[in-house]
Amino acid sequence: MEITNAEFVISNTDVKKCPAGTFPEYAFIGRSNVGKSSLINMLTGRKGLAMTSATPGKTMLINHFLINNSWYLVDLPGYGYARRGQKGQKQIRTIIEDYILEREQMTNLFVLIDSRLEPQKIDLEFMEWLGENGIPFAIIFTKADKLKGGRLKINISAYLRELRKQWEELPPYFITSSEERLGRTEVLNYIESINKELNSK
């Protein structure tokens, strides 16, 4: 897939105010500081499309970007930022859950995982929740360029082993680096394949 057009449409905290229409939506979510904005900018080829912040957990909005005038890329708030406080964390959880459970246009959720870290309980529990609610999702491992030698392969294998404790069938997964544009083609082709399947129905 070639992205010829990517434009910001709207930010909000209320799923009912998301864009009308039937365009499929591909949402991106992950823990704070997982590299989500950088990944979105890399995928779209637009350096400043999604704002990157030096402060983890700053974004508390659902951001819609219209891609090729045919589908939406949705940037969801990051979860698990402890310094946000209990009230802030509850507010974020409500925004995320309302979008994921109520937004009929959401076609697939991409869960971003920092490839440098060992499996995190918060991510595993979140994916378990997705499974319990029948939400289609894929995993994107980020920051692959930060690991040298065979460390990346070791970390990914460890993560998949952990997932197999919960899942009979593993979700699709992609290995990416925003710095090196690694995984861009694979992720976009995956989105394109789903779009073609939807259009054929």
Swiss-Prot record:
Binding sites annotated in the UniProt record for GTP: 30-37, 57-61, 75-78, 142-145, 175-178
PANTHER family (UniProt xref): ENGB-TYPE G DOMAIN-CONTAINING PROTEIN, MSS1/TRME-RELATED GTP-BINDING PROTEIN
Family membership: Belongs to the TRAFAC class TrmE-Era-EngA-EngB-Septin-like GTPase superfamily. EngB GTPase family.
Cofactors named for this entry: Mg(2+)
CDD domains: YihA_EngB (cd01876)
InterPro entries from the UniProt entry: G_ENGB_dom (IPR030393), GTP-bd (IPR006073), GTP-bd_ribosome_bio_YsxC (IPR019987), P-loop_NTPase (IPR027417)
Domain EngB-type G: start-end pairs: 22-197
SUPFAM superfamilies: P-loop containing nucleoside triphosphate hydrolases
Superkingdom of origin organism: Bacteria
Entry keyword annotation includes Zinc: no
Gene it is expressed from: engB
Natural source organism: Bacteroides fragilis (strain ATCC 25285 / DSM 2151 / CCUG 4856 / JCM 11019 / LMG 10263 / NCTC 9343 / Onslow / VPI 2553 / EN-2)
Annotated positions binding Mg(2+): S37, T59
Record key words, sorted: Cell cycle, Cell division, GTP-binding, Magnesium, Metal-binding, Nucleotide-binding, Septation
GO molecular function: GTP binding; metal ion binding
Cross-referenced Gene3D superfamilies: P-loop containing nucleotide triphosphate hydrolases
Name of the protein: Probable GTP-binding protein EngB
Function comment: Necessary for normal cell division and for the maintenance of normal septation.
Cell division is among the record's keywords: yes
GO biological process: division septum assembly
